[in-house]
């Protein structure tokens, strides 16, 4: 749960780690605007929460390693850890999903398309 996961996080962070994460989140926005997908892995680096929360479910470290090895452009923990997001080229998605499903059968793997319109009210 989010509440339990938050307990693994420190109450304070170093200025270095905070600046690192702010720079990466800014870079991530730039990557999506410029479509420089080769920079996604760097833009997804984190020093604030991912590794601390992933320690609650250590298999996620192997998931991230395998996903990046199998073609993911970025592999990140989303939120408190109920979701792990891997972004890859469309041509690699089935192969990546299949590989992760076979190797990590205890997890549910969903292969989804990007939604470039988001939420709309008509």
Briefly describe each language-model feature range:
Residues 1-31, 40:
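Anionic-ligand binding region
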Residues 32-122:
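Glycine-rich, charge-dense phosphate/pyrophosphate-binding loop(s)
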């Amino acid at each position: 749960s989010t509440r339990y996961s938050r307990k693994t996080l420190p109450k304070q962070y170093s200025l270095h780690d905070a600046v690192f994460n702010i720079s990466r989140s800014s870079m991530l926005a730039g990557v999506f605007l410029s479509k420089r997908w080769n920079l996604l892995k760097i833009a997804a680096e984190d020093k604030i929460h991912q590794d601390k929360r992933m320690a609650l479910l250590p298999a996620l470290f192997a998931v991230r390693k395998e996903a990046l090895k199998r073609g993911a452009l970025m592999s990140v923990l989303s939120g408190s850890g109920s979701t792990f997001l891997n972004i890859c080229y469309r041509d690699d998605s089935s192969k990546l999903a299949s590989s992760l499903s076979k190797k990590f059968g205890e997890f549910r793997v969903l292969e989804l398309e990007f939604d470039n319109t988001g939420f709309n009210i008509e």
